[in-house]
From Swiss-Prot:
GO annotation (BP), single: macroautophagy
Family the UniProt entry places it in: Belongs to the small GTPase superfamily. Rab family.
InterPro entries, alphabetized: P-loop_NTPase, Rab, Small_GTP-bd, Small_GTPase
Recorded consequence of changing C206S: Abolishes membrane association. Lethal
Documented effect of changing N121I: Abolishes GTP binding
Organism of derivation: Saccharomyces cerevisiae (strain ATCC 204508 / S288c)
Keyword Zinc-finger annotated: no
Gene3D superfamilies: P-loop containing nucleotide triphosphate hydrolases (3.40.50.300)
Name of protein: GTP-binding protein YPT1
GO cellular-component term (any): cytoplasmic vesicle
Amino acid sequence: MNSEYDYLFKLLLIGNSGVGKSCLLLRFSDDTYTNDYISTIGVDFKIKTVELDGKTVKLQIWDTAGQERFRTITSSYYRGSHGIIIVYDVTDQESFNGVKMWLQEIDRYATSTVLKLLVGNKCDLKDKRVVEYDVAKEFADANKMPFLETSALDSTNVEDAFLTMARQIKESMSQQNLNETTQKKEDKGNVNLKGQSLTNTGGGCC
């Protein structure tokens, strides 16, 4: 294990173009915000190290372009991702409607064990909101994924979103390791029993 960190998690940010994925990542990684952020072309990424439950977790966060013409480029990044954050804009109904399509993309390209988080960005724009919290929460619950509303502008829940994702992955990995350890012990017990049986059977042979 690397001495600089205990875990390395690969996260993916997906969602329609213009929902604020890059601004969320910039706020989380550098604690800055800009209105002049240029739309991502293809894929960009940043690295952020955080402390989580006494462990050092290195997050490799990939920011993908939402435009259709980049879809084939970004699809390859689904594989190998531990967690995928689907972002929509609370002031843009179409971006929320698009979440279903993004979930289909995850089913198509990601592993079956990948973890998901739904994020409604731009919650600071209260007067322009068109997607209600309860509607999005119900959708997230139906699809068995956590849900948070964020604002890259004023930092609301931005850190919580990434840490929620990281914690999910860490807990999933811990459970997986526990299951594997239990399975190995069971397998070892079976091997010993079989070995003993074979030894006894062959005891009279020269």
